[in-house]
Amino acid sequence: MKKKAIYPGTFDPFTNGHLDVLERALTIFEEVTVLIAENSNKNTLFTVEERMDAIREITIGMDGLHVEVLHDGLLAEYARDVGANAIIRGVRQVKDFEYEFQLSLLNRHLNPDVTTVFLMPNVKYTYIASSIIKEVAMLGGDVSKFVHPSVLSMLHRKRKELKPNTTS
């Protein structure tokens, strides 16, 4: 049986921390699906299509990697449907772990065949969240150390769309 994992998230935007966790997951699992959540409860900056295109561009050439969208439904059921035996979650701080631990227990209840695997990113990414990256970028700050150049370009374009009288 192939070791297959799902790496779910909003990925708005996909950061170097996300990439770091993904690269670690690919050393453990034969197949990893980056699963973009189309979460109507979150106010996203980028469309699902924009996020999917960005992730595909950043991860081109990575063996065993797939990028999909979860439009609705439960993650545990999706894992069952695609035959995944693990859910990857990046954990930066204790605060993240408490929330993720609760989700892990619920997913295990819904699908006893799936295990949540917690991976810590490189320490240089532990204090950066997508929400902070978006906020700083939309205010004109430099986030180039925390995102891929293509994501940085997307952030600059989005800033110009939303605030047309700004430079950068």
Curated annotation (Swiss-Prot):
Q: Which residues are marked as site: Transition state stabilizer?
A: H18
Explain the purpose of this protein. Answer: Reversibly transfers an adenylyl group from ATP to 4'-phosphopantetheine, yielding dephospho-CoA (dPCoA) and pyrophosphate.
The Swiss-Prot or TrEMBL record lists the needed cofactor(s) as:
Mg(2+)
Q: What class of enzyme is it?
A: transferase
Q: Which GO terms describe its molecular function?
A: ATP binding; pantetheine-phosphate adenylyltransferase activity
Q: Which gene encodes it?
A: coaD
- What is the superkingdom listed in this entry's lineage? Bacteria
This chain's protein is named Phosphopantetheine adenylyltransferase
Annotated pathway: Cofactor biosynthesis; coenzyme A biosynthesis; CoA from (R)-pantothenate: step 4/5
User: Whom does it interact with, and what assembly results?
Assistant: Homohexamer.
UniProt KW RNA-binding keyword: no
Cross-referenced Pfam families, in alphabetical order?
Answer: CTP_transf_like (PF01467)
Q: Which family does it belong to?
A: Belongs to the bacterial CoaD family.
Protein's GO biological process: coenzyme A biosynthetic process
EC number(s) reported in the record: 2.7.7.3
Q: Where is the signal peptide?
A: none
Record-listed substrate binding positions: T10, K42, L75, R89
Primary location group: cytoplasm
| Record-level GO cellular component terms | cytoplasm
User: What residues does ATP bind to?
Assistant: T10, F11, H18, G90, V91, R92, E100, Y125, T126, Y127, I128, A129, S130, S131
Q: According to its UniProt record, which reaction does this protein catalyse?
A: (R)-4'-phosphopantetheine + ATP + H(+) = 3'-dephospho-CoA + diphosphate
Q: Which InterPro entries match?
A: Cyt_trans-like (IPR004821), PPAT (IPR001980), Rossmann-like_a/b/a_fold (IPR014729)
Where does it live in the cell? Cytoplasm
